[in-house]
UniProtKB/Swiss-Prot annotation:
This is Protein arginine N-methyltransferase 2. It is found in: Cytoplasm; Nucleus. GO terms for molecular function: protein arginine N5-methyltransferase activity. The modification Phosphoserine is found at residues 181, 184. Residues 189-412 form the RMT2 domain. The keyword S-adenosyl-L-methionine applies. The keyword tRNA-binding does not apply. One of its GO terms (cellular component) is cytoplasm.
Length: 412
């Protein structure tokens, strides 16, 4: 452990401005990176031992560590449980200094934890100043990254954070709508819609998955979420029979079943995958009097509706597979033209849900993005403690948080 890391274990109490801040500034001004990891310290010590011919040390060292335990991780892990308010302010000042010198907000440490995870373990709530500061740093970093990319949205994939060098600029796509990170040909189905639409699907009792790779397209643990969403889509609960609703992405038909139970005037379903369309025909969705099936990608079918200008919706829901957050931004352009002034837009919110810190960051980014369209996003926080599956029958989980932020987006 370097002197910088040792300082951040808070060896002296109380945590005072006069003791800690000057020392931290000294280390950073002397050239020690704010992203200097414990793993880099260990690698340096390893090389030193090798130069000195310490064979025993060389053989006992694990060269395969790919975590990034940054100074912020050390600070968060060392936070006293009995910390006082005045000490918290000093810690906040230290965090600000680390961020000024380029500290990252979302690296994964040797225990597979983010700084946010560690703050929560040290009795800092999601609304605490330290956790909120971390979220603010994440939002700022992601928006800056988007700006540097010329407007393209490229969120960090937390699966990719393990093994990257903290000093590197990382530009990889993040989980958008039940998508997985791109890392191999096996992942192409989940990351590329054109590949997905040509991929054979399989309906199981409790899930819709890709037949070969076992990617989870939709699972029945989402039922309560879909029930909540279906209620959101009807702005006037006393006039559901006059409502016109659009759902983008049929999947297992969970939300569409809830929508039908409310007997809307018209129920549009946009679906592009041939296997899903075949299932819809087999289950009688094409024969329902108030249902209109839009076969094809929403990018094509909804633009046709927009051009005609004949149909406007009380509620629009979006839940697709293998699309990115950039696709949601593109959808906003269509939504504002198809939704009624008092209408509601919502979507399955899996943005960054493989890590709770990322999930909290993307929650705020959505609020910022919809505001540019003159809209606002209100969230309902829903506990998932007894709902998440064990993921044994799917290749990789697409939702790891024990809570869900349900978005309700309307014109402000």
């Amino acid at each position: 452990m370097s002197e910088l890391h040792a300082l951040l274990t808070f060896p002296e109490r109380p945590i005072s401005q006069s003791y800690y801040v000057p020392k931290l500034q000294h280390f950073l001004k002397s050239g020690i990176p704010a992203t200097y990891t414990l793993e880099q310290v260990a690698a340096f010590e390893h090389e030193e031992k090798n130069r000195n011919g310490d064979k025993e040390f060389r053989e006992s060292t694990d060269d395969n560590k790919t975590s990034n335990t940054t100074p912020l991780h050390v600070l968060a892990r060392s936070l006293p449980l009995d910390i006082k308010d005045e000490e918290l302010q000093v810690v906040m000042d230290m965090m600000n200094i680390l961020f000024e010198y380029g500290a990252g907000w979302n690296f994964i440490d040797y225990e597979d934890k983010t700084v946010g995870d560690l703050f929560l373990e040290r009795n800092q709530s999601r609304e605490s100043p330290l956790y909120r500061r971390l979220v603010e740093a994440g939002v700022s970093a992601e928006l800056l990254l988007r700006k540097l990319n010329g407007g393209d949205v490229e969120f960090l994939d937390t699966d990719e954070l393990i093994g990257i060098e903290p000093e590197e600029s990382v530009q990889t796509a993040v989980d958008g709508q039940k998508e997985e990170s791109v890392g191999s040909d096996d992942d192409a189905t989940a990351a590329n819609q054109q590949v997905y639409l040509k991929t054979e699907l399989e309906y199981k009792d409790d899930a819709l998955i890709t037949k070969e790779n076992k990617d989870g397209v939709m699972m029945d643990w989402e039922t309560k979420i879909m029930e909540l969403a279906s209620e959101t889509l009807f702005p006037d609960p006393e006039a559901t029979n006059s409502a016109t609703i659009l759902n983008i992405g049929f999947g297992m038909g969970i939300i569409d079943t809830f929508i039908q139970a409310r007997k809307p005037y018209r129920h549009y379903i946009c679906e592009a995958h041939p296997d899903v369309l075949a299932k819809m025909k087999m289950d009688g969705w094409y024969e329902k009097d108030n249902v209109v099936i839009l076969e094809g990608r929403w990018q094509d079918t909804l633009n046709n509706l927009l051009d005609k200008g004949e149909v406007f919706f009380d509620g629009i829901y979006y839940d697709t597979f293998s699309e990115h957050y950039q696709d949601i931004l593109d959808l906003y352009d269509v939504v504002v033209g198809l939704i009624k002034p008092e209408g509601v837009f919502s979507f399955f919110n899996g943005l960054g849900a493989d890590r709770s810190l990322c999930y909290d960051v993307y929650k705020e980014i959505v609020e910022i993005d919809v505001a540019t369209y003159g809209m606002k996003c209100d969230y309902t926080r829903y506990s998932l403690d007894e709902q998440l599956p064990d993921w044994n029958d799917v290749k990789r989980s697409y939702f790891n948080c024990n809570y869900y932020y349900h978005p309700r987006i309307t014109f402000a």
